[in-house]
Amino acid sequence: MDTRLLNAFVVLADTGHFGEASKQLCISQPALTKQIKTLESQLDIVLFERGRHGAKLTQEGQYLLNQAQVVLRESHILEKQARQLVEPQKVSLYAGFGLSSLSFITSLLARFNQIEPNISVNIDDMSSHKMEEKLLIGELDVAFSRLPVMPPLQGIALTQEQLMLAIATQHITVLEADYNPLHYFDSLGLILLAPEKGKKLYQQIHAFLQQHKLAPRLLQQSQDIQTQLALVAAGLGIALVPKSAQLICDKQRVTLLPLSGLYTQWKIGVIWNSNIKNKERDL
């Protein structure tokens, strides 16, 4: 069976939308539709219910999804091990990272390069949810992301992240050490990060809003934190972002106010798949 078809199946199941899935796969929507129909024909099973709101897994599709993920995982591991046998002198590690690890990952990689100059490290920026997916199927050897994680993934905490309220400096009315910034939710709309771009952060933000009984006016969804901050800087609303966003925000126009209470802090660490052995990673 063509693993490309299985990969298309898994990505579409994850996104639930042909447009988003085709972007991730770098193919056209008609090509993706053809791949899914080909797989359904081969299996003689309807995997998705198509509708105006996207693609939803059928009961049969849901049942087969886990098996498809297992096959892809083993396929990636086999390909990687085969490459290492053919070219054992070329050793590479593949690492995922996000904004929350940006403050320390460069110095960490520089130190690793001094210790192991013959091992190249390829890094890729992605969401924590995507990192976990790629670790599970063997596409990443290690990731620097949020904790905790579920087995077989394991992690060690390296630093702590905090939820902040990003607000245009022009909108700030009071800046006192003991002042609660939650009142800004009453007057300013919220600019959210699209859930598919940061699923865990999106879930945490909603948990925070529910915990504090906040129901802000939702203005729009952004595809990345940089765009969120740009919209905030323009005075179009407020946003909930990790503290590490201070590395990329316009500090003259945007102020980050710390939030306290439940769902405002989480740990960032190094994560790996304990089911996949890798001597270079485990050095």
Task: Report the location of each language-model feature.
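Flexible hinge/capping segments at coil-to-helix
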Residues: 86, 157-191
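Beta-alpha-beta core module
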Residues: 151-157, 161-162, 226-275
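Alpha-helical linker/hinge and terminal dimerization helices associated
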Residues: 42-43, 64-86
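N-terminal winged-helix
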Residues: 29-30, 87-116, 120-125, 129-133, ...
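Short beta-strand-centered segments that line the small-molecule binding cleft or hinge
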Residues: 66, 107-111, 124, 128-168, ...
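Secondary-structure junction motif
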Residues: 188-212, 278-280
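A short LG(V/I)-centered, amphipathic sequence patch enriched
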Residues: 40-57
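Short helix-boundary/capping micro-motifs
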Residues: 10-28
